[in-house]
Regions:
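Bacterial Sec-dependent N-terminal signal peptides
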Residues: 1-25
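N-terminal hydrophobic or amphipathic segments with adjacent small-residue motifs
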Residues: 3-6, 14, 34, 191, ...
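Residue-level detector of intrinsically disordered/flexible regions characterized by low predicted structural confidence
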Residues: 4-5, 114-115, 203, 242
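Intrinsically disordered and other compositionally biased segments
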Residues: 6-7, 11, 143, 182, ...
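Flexible, active-site-adjacent loop/turn segments at secondary-structure boundaries
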Residues: 17, 42, 244
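Acidic (Asp/Glu) and glycine-rich low-complexity loops/linkers
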Residues: 20-39, 43-158, 162-175, 183-185, ...
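Short, surface-exposed interaction patches in beta-rich subdomains
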Residues: 165-167, 182-307
Length: 307
């Protein structure tokens, strides 16, 4: 693996403020990469470019421990914390210690995969363009207003990751687990959503078809317009698609799950456990089974449960 290490003696920039951290700046050029893996709490800005490079600005105390490496077509951003001196470890763990600066601009023309964890902050200067793009954010990653233009997009959020997306793609597959959350605007032909844990998801857009799998105590809200939607809900999950205007809907619920649906033409339902289906408009209704569950029109004032 070709490894680039920042040396503290390079280009140290000192702020006029005595409280500011001294930083080391460096630009590194690469022949190419298609993936990015961010392993520590870097603040990363993705910048579309015809060439491949990174611009780094990092705390001089840890500059020699910062790694920017390309391995197997993947740009890896990491910090070798095990090699910190005892004095530095003590300093960084001290009360009111300021986290080290770890700012990176990544320049590349196209990406296939972005993986980030450990409280990294991700943004982009312009639209991220790709053919097939895979994204996995975990461990309190914060993604700010990522605009994606691709043929197919696959997104997975875990462990308190929080993200804001604008997506233009033919296919979108989105998975949210644990206590992750996302807000997104989507323009797509097909969207598949898998929500579990206590994840919270807000999705607005234009779709042809939407497929939803909701489990545990997840909460997913849809708005926009489309052709057809299918929902499978279990646990105490909630799917609120009341503001999503669709022609057709198929809903299967179990346990204490709740679904609000807005189907203009046709609605098919199977309700088990103590589940509840609330529907809008006046569709043709086909019931496969209802066992210890309820189905009501949204205008029914007797039902005031908000999930």
């Amino acid at each position: 693996m070709k490894k680039f290490v920042l040396i503290a003696s390079l280009l140290a920039l000192v702020s006029a403020s005595s409280f500011a951290q001294k930083t080391v700046d460096q630009t590194i050029d690469y022949t190419g990469f298609r993936n990015i893996e961010i392993k520590k709490a870097f603040e990363v800005e993705i910048c579309p470019s015809e060439t491949y490079s990174v611009q780094l600005s990092v705390d001089e105390r840890i500059a020699e421990n910062v790694i920017a490496a390309v391995n197997n077509n993947t740009l890896i951003l990491d910090v070798d914390e095990k090699s910190y001196s005892k004095e530095l470890k003590k300093e960084l763990k001290a009360k009111n210690s300021i986290p080290p600066v770890l700012r990176v601009k990544v320049f590349c023309p196209i990406l296939n995969k972005i993986v980030a964890g450990d409280k990294a902050v991700i943004s982009a200067s312009e639209n991220i363009k790709a053919d097939d793009l895979s994204i996995e954010f975990s461990n309190s990653v914060l993604a700010r207003n990522l605009v994606i233009d691709a043929k197919a997009v696959k997104i997975k959020l875990l462990n308190k990751a929080n993200a804001r997306f604008d997506i233009y793609a033919n296919e979108v597959e989105y998975s949210a687990e644990n206590s992750s959350s996302a807000t997104m605007v989507v323009n797509t032909n097909t969207m598949i959503v898998s929500a579990s844990g206590s994840s919270v998801n807000t999705i607005d857009g234009e779709y042809n078809s939407v497929e939803v799998h909701a489990r545990n105590s997840s909460a997913t809200t849809f708005s926009g317009n489309g052709n057809k939607i299918s929902v499978e809900g279990s646990g105490s999950s909630s799917v609120n698609a009341d503001a999503l205007s669709m022609r057709e809907a198929s809903v299967k619920l179990s346990n204490s799950s709740v679904c609000k649906i807005n189907a203009k033409d046709n609605l098919k339902g199977e309700l088990l456990g103590s589940s509840h289906l609330i529907y809008n408009s006046a569709p043709k209704i086909e019931i496969e089974r209802i066992v210890n569950s309820t189905m009501t029109r949204s205008s029914d004032t007797k039902y005031n449960k908000n999930k």
